From Swiss-Prot:
The gene is luxS. The keyword Iron applies. The lineage of its organism: Bacteria, Pseudomonadati, Pseudomonadota, Gammaproteobacteria, Alteromonadales. Binds 1 Fe cation per subunit. It comes from Shewanella sp. (strain MR-7). This is S-ribosylhomocysteine lyase. GO terms for molecular function: iron ion binding; S-ribosylhomocysteine lyase activity. Belongs to the LuxS family. Signal peptide: none annotated. Transmembrane segments: none annotated.
Length: 169
């Protein structure tokens, strides 16, 4: 099985909260696609709550589009990581890590402005596979933690696992 890019970086050295360019690709027509690792918490040290990350999934996707989409950037998808330490964001374009970090922080401010659980988008059995598994309070706790900590940048060169280590795993 091929080694996926996300498993060639040392998760024990990742900072969080932090933005990392996980991958650059181009479509056959030459459009740039960038995949970002939006690491909310340090791998193997902390984990986002099940209800909190699910609520963030519903809120974050729209808020990030509000703050980052423009003439040269269009978000394709924002999805939670299976390990529950963050989200992957795929987009058309090549915004800087700082632009992404600023949009992320602005989105967390937006999460804090949501007053009631009923304001969570697509919170119904027709549009959500587990619509009762949400917590606005937990999502807002996560948002407060991100704002308080600030968002840094993780660089692949700083996190790259050596061929020797990869060979031992």
């Amino acid at each position: 099985m091929p080694l996926l890019d996300s498993f060639t970086v040392d998760h024990t050295r990742m900072n969080a909260p932090a933005v990392r360019v996980a991958k650059h690709m181009s479509t056959p027509k030459g459009d740039a696609i960038t995949v970002f690792d939006l690491r909310f918490c340090a791998p193997n040290k902390d984990i986002l709550s099940e209800r909190g990350i699910h609520t963030l999934e519903h809120l974050f996707a729209g808020f990030m589009r509000d703050h980052l989409n423009g003439s040269d950037v269009e978000i394709i998808d924002i999805s939670p990581m299976g390990c529950r330490t963050g989200f992957y964001m795929s987009l058309i374009g090549e915004p800087s890590e700082r632009q992404v970090a600023d949009a992320w922080l602005a989105s967390m401010e937006d999460v804090l402005k949501v007053v009631e659980q009923s304001e969570i988008p697509e919170l119904n059995e027709y549009q959500c596979g587990t619509y009762q598994m949400h917590s606005l309070e937990q999502a807002q706790d996560i948002a407060r933690n991100i704002i308080a900590a600030g968002v840094s940048v993780n660089r692949n060169d700083d996190l790259k696992l050596s061929d020797e280590i990869l060979g031992q795993l």
